Structures are given as C-alpha cells and as structure tokens.
Amino acid sequence: MASSEETPRSLAGKVALVTGAGRGIGKGIAVELAKRGASVVVNYNSAEKPAQEVVDEIAKTGSRAVAIKADITKVPEVSRLFQEALQHFGHLDIVVSNSGTEVFKPEDEVTEEDYDRVFNLNTRAQFFIAQHAYVHLRNGGRIVLMSSVAANMSGIPNHALYAGSKAAVEGFTRSFAVDAGHKKITVNAIAPGGVKTDMYDANAWHYVPNGKPGMPMEEIDKGLAAFCPLGRVAVPQDIGRVVAFLAHPDSEWVNGQVILLTGGSVT
C-alpha cells in the first residue's frame, strides 16, 4: 500500500463531502481523497468519536477535514449538511454518497418498517444527496453514488429488499448524469462486492456456498477469495482508490456509469 508521501496530491484545492465516512468504506474513501490533497467533510450520524478519529487521520496526511453530524434520511438535515460544509470550506467539488444498510429477509416476512428503513437510507437518502450535490457543486464537479453487486446478482435468497434499493440508485446515476451535464458534473456509481467492514462481518456468510451463521471469519474470507482471480477480498482502501480516480479531472469521460468493484470475482 502506498504511503501518503508516495501518493500524488492530484486533488489539491478540491473539497469533498463523504457521507457515512466515520467507518468502513466511507472512511476508506475519505482518507484516500485526503491523501491526494482534497479537504474532506466527514459526515456521520451517531458515531462521533470514530468520525473525529477519521478527521485526525486525515490531518496526518496534510489535508484538512471537519466532521459534521447529519441524519441523511431527513432532507432538512441534508440541506444543513451542505450549508455547513459550504460555510466551512467555501465550495464543494466532490460528493460521495456512501449510505447503506443490508438486510436478508424472506419476502413474505418483510414489513413496512423494514421497507422504509432500507429504502430511506439506501435509496431516498442517496437521491437527495445527489440532488443537493447537483445544486451546490462547482462546475466540473464529481458525484459518486453507492450501488452494490447485489443490484444485478441472481441466486441470492431473501435479498430482494436490499437488491432493489441499490438497483434504483443505478437508475438515478444515469439520469443525473444527463441532467448535470450542462455544469460539466459527472455522475457515476460504484458497485462493490464484499469489502472487509463491519457490514461484511455481519452478512458475508450469506454469499458463501453452504454458509451459515457463526461461520468463522477465516472460512468466509477463504470462501469468497476463491471466487476472485486476485485471491483475496476487498478492503476499504481498494474502494477509496477507485473513487479517487473518479474524482480526478482526468476521469471526465467516465460518466453515467456503474462500475463493478469485485477484483474480477465470478460467482
């Protein structure tokens, strides 16, 4: 893994806002953008201490960061998040919507509460983050939304709610890319497979053949790595590096795309 000293500061002068950046994939994205010189707004909802630790880690890269609390399932809080970000840094160039919660539940047991909880965070929140980004980003900005390989996978039982919530995001991506074009803003989505986070720890066994609850993590990792030509599962830095590319000025011709981030895994 390259150190911050070895990473060109290709995003110097840019300001990024990353939702759900206090841990997991969001943290990995925030840190990778910071390594390249971007100032970063670290959004969190409840985990204030981890978010501040991300801010402190970013400071060690030589970049600036601020943690801002906001529940992005509530549109007034999304508006406040953007206003506070603009007040702090003066402008925004990059917005990464990293919200997501995963659920496995038989379709005949899904309740209204389940549906609202998953779609409010995975889908509705991402729409309004993209909407605010479209309004507030400077010309030439970058929007990156979060889909999942699950949006297009078949053969995973009890997964309709999560898969559907992410599939909608792919539709948002293509439509926003058209509408934001006059501002030279690109809009893309990433669709990671398994990434070593707390969500992975809780749910990855579902994707392993003959997986079961309580399965040792070493067996889960081995089972999923066997599908990948690179022989491992992803870590948040892998995702952050791709987002850093999409945030770079050189990525302008990548627009309206959903990029699978699986290391070439075949399941």
UniProtKB/Swiss-Prot annotation:
Q: Which family does it belong to?
A: Belongs to the short-chain dehydrogenases/reductases (SDR) family.
What InterPro entries has UniProt attached to this entry? NAD(P)-bd_dom_sf, Sc_DH/Rdtase_CS, SDR_fam
State the encoding gene. Answer: Arp2
The region annotated as signal peptide is none
Its Enzyme Commission number?
1.1.-.-
Q: List the disulfide bonds.
A: none
Q: Which UniProt keywords apply?
A: NADP, Oxidoreductase
Q: Which GO terms describe its molecular function?
A: oxidoreductase activity
- Native organism is Metarhizium guizhouense (strain ARSEF 977)
Write the protein's name.
Hydroxynaphthalene reductase-like protein Arp2
